[in-house]
């Protein structure tokens, strides 16, 4: 597509919210002291897969991109651009983290360093492809500016590994589910980027496998009561974040022929099944209270967003402070209720799935 440079807008920052993609850092020295010998062969095998670079020639724009997109209505276009923006930011965040891990671990952990370097290659490729797609709608992210001016959220290494493993796996299930749906219903493919999701999601899957292999090399991350609590927490945090985000943007999923709630339920179920191959415990999604509580959280979150979007007199603003506090209280209360729902031991869960 030929762009009008006068209309192309460059965005340097993204709005920071509780649910927005973030940039992470960690204790690199702690990771450099890991003993990965117990699972070295699996880690090395995955790095060998990364070296093959199966998608080296995959992310090449074809002639289908060479057109205008004025047929997409304004609301759908806005929601789609938001989808591209969030996806690009998340991929770029992964690129920065993996690149820094590769740099910091190069001397002491060369195999891990190479794995992270090759994953950063994939993430950069994804982010660049998404940013070019945004340019088709006259918007780009200034990734160079974001690199220099990013704000970090610090996570301990074990939290990085739990969260990123799940993020990569849920990314896989999101991409492959959208791809399979649009293969069956091509009339809903509003933009050609969706054709790339089948091979794209395999990068996400391999990245998740790499994190799983590292976690397995550190038994303390999977053994004991405390580890079970952390696995439960990150499963819930990742699932709730996706659910609340997608409920905000339901019109986008409807525009490609998906029911946003059913899409999220399916992705959560499949990610939960994937996590059962690694984690000692997973969530009991058959408990009807699980999605009931998530729906309540989504409702409270929507009300909070509506308050922030309204311009109101000072008196109403004061009242809204208390109302927002009440809604946050309900959100936290429901999250706590979700956290303390009974979980499923993974040995019994695997038998149930089979």
Curated annotation (Swiss-Prot):
<comment type="similarity">
    <text>Belongs to the AcsF family.</text>
</comment>
<keyword id="KW-0602">Photosynthesis</keyword>
<dbReference type="GO" id="GO:0009507">
    <property type="term" value="C:chloroplast"/>
</dbReference>
<keyword id="KW-0150">Chloroplast</keyword>
<dbReference type="GO" id="GO:0036068">
    <property type="term" value="P:light-independent chlorophyll biosynthetic process"/>
</dbReference>
<comment type="pathway">
    <text>Porphyrin-containing compound metabolism; chlorophyll biosynthesis (light-independent).</text>
</comment>
<keyword id="KW-0934">Plastid</keyword>
<keyword id="KW-0149">Chlorophyll biosynthesis</keyword>
<comment type="function">
    <text>Catalyzes the formation of the isocyclic ring in chlorophyll biosynthesis. Mediates the cyclase reaction, which results in the formation of divinylprotochlorophyllide (Pchlide) characteristic of all chlorophylls from magnesium-protoporphyrin IX 13-monomethyl ester (MgPMME).</text>
</comment>
<dbReference type="GO" id="GO:0005506">
    <property type="term" value="F:iron ion binding"/>
</dbReference>
<dbReference type="GO" id="GO:0048529">
    <property type="term" value="F:magnesium-protoporphyrin IX monomethyl ester (oxidative) cyclase activity"/>
</dbReference>
<keyword id="KW-0479">Metal-binding</keyword>
<dbReference type="InterPro" id="IPR008434">
    <property type="entry name" value="AcsF"/>
</dbReference>
<dbReference type="InterPro" id="IPR003251">
    <property type="entry name" value="Rr_diiron-bd_dom"/>
</dbReference>
<dbReference type="Pfam" id="PF02915">
    <property type="entry name" value="Rubrerythrin"/>
</dbReference>
<dbReference type="GO" id="GO:0015979">
    <property type="term" value="P:photosynthesis"/>
</dbReference>
<dbReference type="InterPro" id="IPR009078">
    <property type="entry name" value="Ferritin-like_SF"/>
</dbReference>
<protein>
    <recommendedName>
        <fullName>Magnesium-protoporphyrin IX monomethyl ester [oxidative] cyclase</fullName>
        <ecNumber>1.14.13.81</ecNumber>
    </recommendedName>
</protein>
<keyword id="KW-0560">Oxidoreductase</keyword>
<keyword id="KW-0408">Iron</keyword>
<keyword id="KW-0521">NADP</keyword>
């Amino acid at each position: 597509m030929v762009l009008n440079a006068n209309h192309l807008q460059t965005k340097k920052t993204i709005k920071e919210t509780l649910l927005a993609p973030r940039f992470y850092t960690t204790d690199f020295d702690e990771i450099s002291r890991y003993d990965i010998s117990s699972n070295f062969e699996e880690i090395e095998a995955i790095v060998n897969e990364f070296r093959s670079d199966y998608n080296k020639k995959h992310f090449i724009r074809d002639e289908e991109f060479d057109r205008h997109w004025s047929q997409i209505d304004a609301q759908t276009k806005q929601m789609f651009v938001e989808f591209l923006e969030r996806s690009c930011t998340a991929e770029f965040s992964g690129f920065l983290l993996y690149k820094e891990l590769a740099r910091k671990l190069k001397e002491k952990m060369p195999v891990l360093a190479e794995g992270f370097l090759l994953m950063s290659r994939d993430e950069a490729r994804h982010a660049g492809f998404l940013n070019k797609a945004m340019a088709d709608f006259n918007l780009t992210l200034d990734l160079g500016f974001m690199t220099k001016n990013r704000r970090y959220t610090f996570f301990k290494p074990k939290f990085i590994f739990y969260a990123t493993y799940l993020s990569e796996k849920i990314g896989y299930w999101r991409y492959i589910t959208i791809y399979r749906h649009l293969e069956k219903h091509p009339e809903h493919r509003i933009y050609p980027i969706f054709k790339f999701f089948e091979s794209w999601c395999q990068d996400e899957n391999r990245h998740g496998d790499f994190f799983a292999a590292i976690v397995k090399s550190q038994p303390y991350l999977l053994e004991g009561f405390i580890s079970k609590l952390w696995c439960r927490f990150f499963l819930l945090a990742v699932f709730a974040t996706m659910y609340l985000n997608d409920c905000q943007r339901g019109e986008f999923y409807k525009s490609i022929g998906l029911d946003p709630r059913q899409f999220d339920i399916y992705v959560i179920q499949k990610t939960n099944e994937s996590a059962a191959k690694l984690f000692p415990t997973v969530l009991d999604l058959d408990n009807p209270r699980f999605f009931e509580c998530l729906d309540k959280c989504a409702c409270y979150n929507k009300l909070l967003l509506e308050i922030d979007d309204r311009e109101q007199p000072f008196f109403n603003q004061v009242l809204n402070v208390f109302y927002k506090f009440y809604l946050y209280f309900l959100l936290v209360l429901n999250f706590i209720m979700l956290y303390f729902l009974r979980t499923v031991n993974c040995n019994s869960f695997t038998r149930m799935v089979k």
